[in-house]
Amino acid sequence: METVENLAMLPLHDATLVRLTVEWQEGVCTADILGALRPGASMARLRWTGVTSIDIPHGAPWGPSAQILEGRGPLRNGRWEMTMQSGDMIAVCATACAMELDPRGGGGR
């Protein structure tokens, strides 16, 4: 796992959010993302630890989409944001974020 210092620096635009999971007891949230974040990698996983809150709206004010528009964070109070091309903003408040490429062993789904 590689520490993410600035979510905005990752090439998330047009990547697909496949799955978002929460491990409540551990305070962990993971996002499985399809789309080359690095050359040769098709699937990546963002993993937030020390999670204190999560906001996952799914109203799609701009229309349905599973693609990411942009990422931001960490902002104040450890807030990390992913704006979806649907117009929804997913927000995770956490102490840290890390990225793992090809978490399922290369190639995604």
Model-predicted segments: where are they?
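Surface-exposed, interaction-prone regions used to assemble/regulate multi-protein complexes
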Residues: M1-R109
